[in-house]
Regions:
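Short beta-strand and adjacent tight-turn residues that come in two discontinuous sequence segments
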Residues: 21, 71, 92, 181, ...
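A contiguous binding-surface segment within folded domains or other stable secondary-structure elements
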Residues: 185-237
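A residue-level marker of the well-folded mature domains of exported/periplasmic proteins
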Residues: 130, 161, 168, 191-198, ...
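Proline-aspartate-enriched helix->loop->beta-strand connector
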Residues: 48-52, 58-71, 87, 190-206
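A short, structured surface patch at a secondary-structure boundary
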Residues: 2-60, 68-70
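Extracytoplasmic substrate-binding proteins
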Residues: 78-158, 180, 187-188, 230-231, ...
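Alpha-helical, coiled-coil/dimerization segments enriched in small aliphatic residues
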Residues: 160-185
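Solvent-exposed loop/turn segments at secondary-structure junctions
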Residues: 3-6, 25-28, 68-69, 74-77, ...
Length: 286
């Protein structure tokens, strides 16, 4: 196949030997993740047939005898072109909650003939949701003042944030308030974020920014010195496992949920050790 979501495909197949092409951003994710050790065969994978804007080189894919393409549901026109050439195309969407993520894994399991593995993963998702649902009454009892304001960065340099979808869903589930944009604003600005004054900031692996860059106010053109999360040293770099944990369609999303929950509401989510959870998962699964 040629695809987005190589981390999910690897998780279901247990190998990456049949991956023909992945986007450059997915390749950079491979370089920084444990997938580099688990799937060294991706070192020489093509990154020119599927672009970071998810457009594809239809002719090149046909010449490469690709028998399946996985891409986002925004690429319907190219999917039709591929189908006209006899290349099946599975279109996926960004999960907005854990049910959406389960549906995605099930669909990929069917497409890749990995139904049993997919069922194992969705059972894990169900167990995770059962755990969070068991905390629902405690979370519901929180006052607004007890729910910290949370900002999830996608890319700090570009000032792009996760303002909706599954990350907002998760933040609410664990007792936080996720940053959202006012209706009349389409892109976040420093002014908008300063007005929001996040108490917790999560930064993804789509850039090289570290918490220390915030604490030492090193980010060019941005002054974070008066932001609560920075003053209280509550800026966190999101881990990277098989792939970056922050994006919506990440296989290890339950680990992301438990990791962020232990930061957002440490008193409620205190009945597990996140390092043990992470270590046990990778030992058991791989």
């Amino acid at each position: 196949p040629a695809m987005v979501l190589p981390n999910m495909v690897y998780a279901l197949q247990g190998n990456a030997e049949n991956m023909v092409s992945i986007p450059p951003a997915a390749y950079s994710g491979w370089e920084m993740s444990i997938l580099k050790d688990l799937a060294p065969e991706l070192e020489d994978v093509d990154t020119t047939m599927v672009n970071d804007d998810f457009s594809v080189n239809v002719e090149a894919l046909a010449d490469a005898d690709v028998d399946l393409v996985l891409n986002w549901d925004s690429e319907t026109d190219q999917a039709e072109q591929l189908k006209a050439l006899g290349i099946p195309c599975v279109l996926v969407s960004s999960a907005k909650d854990m049910d959406g993520l389960k549906s995605l894994v099930t669909m990929l399991g069917d497409a890749l003939n990995c139904e049993d593995r997919a069922k194992q993963v969705t059972d894990w998702y169900d167990e995770t949701m059962d755990y969070f649902n068991s905390k629902a009454d405690e979370v519901a009892a929180l006052s607004e003042d007890e729910m910290p304001r949370v900002l999830h960065f996608q890319n700090v340099h570009e000032m792009t944030c996760y303002t909706g979808g599954i990350n907002t869903y998760i933040t609410t589930l664990e007792g936080g308030q996720n940053f959202t944009l006012p209706e009349d604003i389409t892109e976040p600005s420093m002014e908008t974020i300063l007005e929001y004054d996040p108490e917790i900031i999560f930064i993804s692996n789509f850039d090289d920014v570290t918490p220390e860059d915030f604490y030492e106010n090193k980010l060019e053109g941005q002054d974070w010195s008066n932001v609560s999360a920075v003053k209280n040293h509550k800026v966190y770099k999101v881990p990277c496992g098989l792939y970056r944990w922050a994006p919506p369609n990440t296989f290890e999303k339950p680990l992301y949920m438990k990791w962020t929950a232990s930061i957002v509401q440490p008193e409620i989510f205190s009945d597990y050790d996140i390092r043990t959870e992470i270590s046990d998962f990778y030992k058991d699964y791989y």
